[in-house]
Each structure stands twice: as structure tokens, then as C-alpha cells.
């Protein structure tokens, strides 16, 4: 009897553990529910200041320090295998030369990545499948340069069981998004990108808001000509969707960028959060942003 009871207790414990949501599930729910209690941090190209951009090591480091989303880029090999790399050519970030589309997957696997200073490292060029298996259960993944590959990447996401961890983005009009990708939008999160300085920004936004009903929007503006509309969107999206800003360079967020944050984090990150309603920020300085948010009790 004692052994039976012990066995039942262990089974119940294992069942409870298995049913607990993983961190990626929790983060996805924060976005879907419009949770504004914290600010989510996105590591651009997987935190390239620590390890080669778009590398497995960069993803692992991002997870270790508490990043919520890693942004990764996709390119396609000659034999239609998706690799995690930003440029269409190999020279800047790898030991290879030429266009990725001229190399087979097996040949790309022989290359080594370069670090931020352009020095060859021992890190290899990862496939999308390899990257998603590392991220699985730990962190959300924003796939950039990827909407052109939707039909190729979805089988990879299904195979790895990571489709619900992915945020896709693009700037096509709402009707086109629904026509091209509608079959996938119940799994991946689709995020419209909107440049507020462009003349058609309001028309595009109305389409996204009324037709797609997206749960997150990536907004950008280069100067104060668009600050009024940015503040208007803060009110319009309040309680309906989260706002994402990039602080990678000054023309993406009206000068409230990572470089400014080195000496004036309140004027950079604080402005985007408090004045423009940002609840997701993509950065090239993930640890700096995390420290700032934690000092304000805006991140665990």
C-alpha cells in the first residue's frame, strides 16, 4: 500500500509539472492578454555584443540574462534550407564569400561566424531548426526577413513544436496579410510594422486595427513630426494591443535610442515607456535595458 501511495504521489507530481506552462508560453500570454505591468526586452540579432550575431551562443546568453524575445534573421540556402543570418551575402558575418543562395546547406555548415569586430570565431552558422530548438520553451523569437519564407518556415516550426513562440512582422496592407498568411495567424503572432513619418501611416494603421486586430504593433518615427501621432496611438491602443519600439539607432525612435541611454536612460527608454506607451523594446544593449527596467520594477 505504501508503495502504491508513493507511486501515485510521484505520478501526480509529474503530471502537475508537465502541465505547468513554460516561460515562452507565459510570455506569449502576456502579449495576447495585453499585459502592461512589465516591459518586454528584445535582443537584436540575439545580443550580438556578447557573441556573434544570430549565433546559438547569442541566443543562449539572451536566455541566461532574462531577455524575453530574441530577434533573428533568415536567409535561404541553394537547396532551400533556412539559416539564421542577416545579410544575403556571407562576407560580413562569416568566413565565407558570395551569396548564401549560391551555397548548399552542407557547405554553409563548414563556415565560421565572425564577431562584432569582424574576427573569425569558432561559432558555426545555425539553421532555423537548430536555433528554434535552443529557444524552445525559454524565449519568444521574432523572425525578421521571414514573411517571404512563410511556407518554408512553418514546417520547421511545426517539427520543432515552436510555432506559438514566434512573432512574425511585415508592412504589407492588412488585406494582403490576411490573404497570404491567414492560415498561420492562429499560431504565430503577426506584428504589423508602421513608420509613423510616412504619408500612408494612418491608412495602414486603420486597416491593421479594424481588419487584423493585431495584439502588438512595431512603431517607428525618425523625428518629432510624428510625435503627435505616436501619442495618439498610445491612447488608441491602450488596453487593445502592445506597442513595440526599436532603440537600435536614433532614426527609429526619434533620438530616444541605445546610444542616448548610455548617459540618459530616462530620456531614451523612459520616454518611450512613459510618454509613448512602449511595452516591448528591441535593443542592442539588452543588459543595460534590463538593469534600467528592474530599477523601476518593470521587469523581473
Residue ranges, per PLM feature:
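Positively charged n-region of N-terminal signal peptides that target proteins for export
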Residues: 1-4
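Hydrophobic h-region of N-terminal signal peptides that target proteins for export
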Residues: 9-18
